[in-house]
Amino acid sequence: MQLRAKAREFGRLHDTRLEPAVRAMYPQVAFATRDPQAVEAGGAAISKHLASLELLLSTSPLDPDHLWLCDCGFAVTFAWIEAFEAALGLPVDWPTGVRAYQARIGGFAAVSDELAAYRPAMDDYLTKAYP
């Protein structure tokens, strides 16, 4: 029961905090209408939620040798954060523990295969981010 509760806690952090902060960056993708202040504020919000995630990770009882349902959203969200860093100049502070978590879940074939299939659509979407 405790592991399910912890998995729900991770999932809720993603679904109610981190992912909405990342989603708020989509209106800033188009180069012609980008608001640099919104990008700066978005980076600060995302960084805050990544710091919260690092705190959860530091005390997590979830077995790191298994891929949990709550991990799946983070994999794609991390990919979008990195894409927005490159395309929008999004300033993000990545905690060391979160980068280690990203690498760990990216090591699962289910995640790496999905990201490989998904990335071309991301790249296509981001073409409007450049002049």
Show where each model-derived region lies.
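A short beta-turn/loop motif at secondary-structure boundaries
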Residues: 1-2, 66
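Conserved C-terminal alpha-helical bundle
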Residues: 2-60, 81-87
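Alpha-helical structural motif
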Residues: 3-6, 18, 49, 77, ...
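Residue-level signal for nonpolar/aromatic packing positions in well-ordered secondary structure
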Residues: 7, 53, 71, 105-108
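GST superfamily/GST-like fold recognition
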Residues: 22, 62-87, 91, 97-99, ...
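Acidic/histidine-enriched, glycine/proline-rich intrinsically disordered or flexible terminal extensions
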Residues: 118-131
